[in-house]
Regions:
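Glycine-rich phosphate-binding loops of nucleotide-dependent enzymes
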Residues: 2-270
Length: 270
């Protein structure tokens, strides 16, 4: 099993996977995976198709339960929590397959996420306020709309706020998903193949955008991405999965030259 040396930078992580395993019948999709992620880090997760990357994301965000192992977030075991509970703790994600509300406008997509965040404290009172049109509810609606528009401006979609999500170009839909995730005001942002379908220029802009978002929101970012040059140039550290197992972990220069990685993944890149 790949392990990290205990150093000052890894002794108090914001997130720690400890022996995470996920079985589907006789198939082991994620096999005893352990790693730590530090606050404000951009942490990459790479590997061939079928390596278990998205399954690991699904376990980490509560969409599917781990068969064994634990996920520790800010010294709390969140392994048994449901997705909405994990989101309320401060972990948000995007998906490999875009999951927007296509019939709704861009600003409405972001506003929905803001509602989830702002009303998590007392949903019953918030519901009653909305039903009866109380001033507090009206003020919240205005604040939600204003924040949603600010986030769209941040991701470069301010001029398309009123367009239906389904009519946006693919790259803009990706940015809208990120804006929606940011609306939850997360501490950790998980991005599942954010550069999928983008041309080289768009990928370069995405890298710069992720750095800017990390800085502006004081985020920790964990991303899955198939475009190896993007990951190598963007991430502080990288973990490599192969057939569900962690085969390498470290800074980009170390991972790039790891023989196991070259054989399993990087050697297949054109």
């Amino acid at each position: 099993m790949i392990s990290e040396p205990l150093t000052l930078s890894t002794s108090n992580p914001v997130l720690a996977a400890k022996g995470l395993t996920r079985r589907f019948g006789g198939l082991i999709a994620v096999n005893d995976v352990s790693f730590t992620v530090q606050k404000h880090e951009i942490f990459g997760l790479i590997g061939p198709n079928g390596a278990g990357k998205t399954t690991l994301f699904n376990v980490m965000t509560g969409l599917i339960p781990a068969s064994s192992g634990n996920l520790i977030y800010q010294n709390e075991n969140i392994s048994k929590l449901r997705p909405y509970q994990i989101a309320n703790k401060g972990i948000a994600r995007t998906f490999q397959n875009i999951r927007l509300f296509g019939e709704l406008s861009a600003v409405e997509n972001v506003a929905i996420a803001r509602h989830i965040h702002s009303r998590s404290g007392n949903p019953v009172l918030s519901l009653l306020a909305g039903i009866f049109g109380l001033p507090a509810s009206n003020a919240m609606e205005r604040k939600t709309q204003r924040k949603a528009l600010e986030l769209l401006d941040l991701v470069g979609l301010g001029d398309r706020a009123g367009e239906q999500a389904k009519n946006l170009p693919y790259g803009d839909q990706r940015r809208l998903e990120i804006a929606r995730a940011l609306a939850l005001e997360p501490q950790i942002l998980l991005l599942d193949e954010p550069a999928a379908g983008m041309n080289p220029n768009e990928k370069h802009k995405l890298s710069e955008f992720i750095r800017e978002v990390r800085q502006q929101f004081n985020l920790t970012v964990i991303l899955i991405e198939h475009h190896v040059p993007l990951v190598m140039g963007l991430c502080d550290r990288i973990a490599v999965l192969h057939f569900g197992q962690l085969i390498a972990l470290g800074e980009p220069a170390i991972v790039r030259n790891d023989p196991a990685v070259i054989e399993a993944y990087l050697g297949d890149e054109s």
